[in-house]
């Protein structure tokens, strides 16, 4: 029996070492236990939802043949604000003739922005023939003013990875400009990127676009042109154009004169860095203090491993100042088709510096415009702190979307970013960015919640009003989920150990409360950085007699306590002790009474004895597991990098040197006959005229030598 237990223990431990589950989550909630509101649109056909705009009270959602106006508080539809726009029958039939399905040949709204006060521009796929309409708000409803072609602004396919951002009534878009999707471009009428120029755009998948300073930034992933000599690989990029770029002189009027791009480096450092190369989503630009007194503007990005690799996801933060610095740095150039991409010498860069924002780019010299066409690639953008702030390796899911509730205030006047991360299996992770004071790293505390009932991928995430509320957008469903889990904790210890800046323990009410519901922090207990619960009261099973200055309170405590005379001090089930002053809860130290040294009586009941028996049984079981672990440890060494969620490959070039012979199989010092213990039932081989024992060309060490033979 003991042997069986030992064997099963070893197997269990080996299985755990083979694949460690995601045990870092503080709290895991099932879909049914999450408070949420749902919106399903037509609930029959695919909608391909996308959030077009959001304000303090409403959220505009693009779907199949219409724009929905939803309340951001409960996702109820304001039908007076709905805009219907189906494709015409002619466009639908032409789409069917091109080989598309009926679901493809609909008008999926992808773009909405305000061109001027009181007017909206809406663009849709329109059965693979993009169109844009201008709506004017008159007499309480939106009326169509004009309709124009949307090629270059809106994608043909609702599932195509496109992005757009408006500035000063103009739309900057990143999409494709043909039916097949083979002409990607970054466009603002009339300027666009070069046609069929792989050095500018090479099969990109656009993720997000933001306006910052004098520039519009685009985040995307594409096939790396600088790696083509070695194979095919995907790199993450950030590209920029000037907001007021008017194009170049002469034939370059419809081309950008400020387009530059750089690789986003998200890697785990080491002798051979491990890269997360495929960007999936970015947050908005947020501002805060991260391990310094200076305020920084950063943007969070989700980057993953390729789809055919082991599932790995990482979150890297990039400082906007670093991105701007890279675009002011060295240009990269390939001398010949077989050359490496190297920095361009400074003396070969024309003046004024190409790619800068100028008042009128149409008067730039031709050499500047031509230089920027062929030298759009810059050096890499480093991640903040030089490494990801969160890494997750999982066979079950990958990160797909991210949004940030920036600089949430704690009761200790700390400001921390709360991140919401969507996955491709319908879950939302809540993570807290906790800067460490003396290290260049960020710690995270994570909570995982299942939001979509059928595991549909999360496409978008948006912050909603209220602590912990987030809008989760899927392909055919939108949910307003409350990821504030304060009320689920009933003990001070559990509440504090959540390390959630939204939650704190109210010592006055004995409740785990959301901070936005209280008016005073006086009685709150919270420790987001360490999760230290020393400030908590003892569990309710421990009866404490608290003596305060008020006589009425003293009488109440004496009345509710157990008389010491009625207890037998020799009874081993009775424990008497004195509380130390250090155990006094600071929250209870008020101006009225304060804390006093008091006697603590603890009585162990029958329930306590049952718990002791269970604990002893569990300890006995784990003793067998520990024995198995000891045996297993002899054959399984610990990871050299216990804190890393991956195993870094170290390929030492000197592995065959003298000091590395320990890795090689020792050579035999004498000849070994490998044919031993041949079964008698084995048929004897046929005799020939080659008697090995008579072959003098076989050396004693067993090495065969080439000989000449003559056959008659």
Swiss-Prot record:
Membrane topology annotation: Single-pass type I membrane protein
Going by the UniProt annotation, this protein carries glycans at 42, 69, 161, 265
Regions of this protein lying in the Cytoplasmic compartment: 623-712
Fetch the SMART domains from UniProt. PSI, Sema
- Residue ranges crossing the lipid bilayer per the database entry: 602-622
Q: Which Pfam families match?
A: PSI, Sema
Please give the name of this protein. Semaphorin-1A
